Amino acid sequence: MNKLSTKLVVAIGIGAALYGILGLWGFSIAPNTFIKPALAILTVFGALFGPVAGLLIGLIGHTVTDTIAGWGIWWGWVISSGIIGFSMGLIQKRVGFSVKNGSFNKGDISYLAITGLVGIVIAIIFAGAFDIIVMGEPFDKIVIQVLGATISDVIVFLVLGLPLTIGLAKSNKKHAHLKIEK
């Protein structure tokens, strides 16, 4: 098993704290369902540090949100945040892609968009199924939550997460070619 570097552990801690605290704010769109801008944190940190970091940031951060909010930990939704973070981090495994160095192309952006959207859909369906099967939640309530959560997460991903990640990569590209003059 690969060891986690100190840098990666620190990034996971910072990402989880940001995701956990920012996850407390959102705009209600369905029963217990919110548009939460915090999802952009999973996109940026996943793209920067990879799928393992994205997974752990999602799991830890969502647990922090649920704990602080006081509504109990909803494990299906915690796991779904981990799945989303993992899917956002898959882009980091593409050869030649690097947010840190500003190295990306249209194919990378498409890949991030596709893996992000597929990850969101899989994660939210998992959370809904978990709530019905394990938590005994009513089917009709969960259908509304799943639809609302999917729509809200897709909106946040496309409007905030993807543009922030691309913007950060573009910004780093400008600075990657700077040289120290002697």
Curated annotation (Swiss-Prot):
Where is this chain primarily localised?
membrane
Keyword field contains Repeat: no
Compartments where found: Cell membrane
Give me the Gene Ontology terms describing cellular component. plasma membrane
What membrane topology was assigned to this protein in its record? Multi-pass membrane protein
| Statement: the UniProt record of this protein carries the keyword Membrane | yes
Q: Where are the transmembrane segments?
A: 9-29, 40-60, 71-91, 114-134, 142-162
Keywords, in A-Z order: Cell membrane, Membrane, Transmembrane, Transmembrane helix
What HAMAP family does the entry give?
Answer: UPF0397
Q: Which family does it belong to?
A: Belongs to the UPF0397 family.
Q: Which NCBIfam families match?
A: PRK13661.1
Task: State the name under which the record lists this protein.
Answer: UPF0397 protein BCG9842_B2659
Gene source species? Bacillus cereus (strain G9842)
